[in-house]
Amino acid sequence: MNNLTPYQQTMLATWQQHTYAEFVLKDADVALATMSENPYVLAIPSGTGGMGRIGVREFYASQFLPKIPPDFDLTSLSQTFGYDRIVEEFVIRFTHTLDMDWMLPGVRATGRRVDFALVHHPV
């Protein structure tokens, strides 16, 4: 990643802190500290999320972070950098041991393995 501009390096460091806060620490306040002053989160499968710091914190603390299975694994396959954004391709793997309405709305925990690819582009 030596070819990144200083701004892109800062974006990457912030993104890494953010995903660590989400998937390792599972800490809404630490994740929120990596976001803009007026964040917006939308979980596409369910249409849930939050707007503004209060709304995003509530979504993270009540619907998202506590509903991440303990064996959740996020593996980065590639990152593409634009001037002001990162597009990242992941493989996500977990055992469906929790109801995850933010990702699988209305699907009760099945105990089955789940593996899928995801392209994410935080704005």
Question: Which residues fall in each region the model found?
Answer:
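C-terminal and inter-domain tail/linker signature
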Residues: 1-123
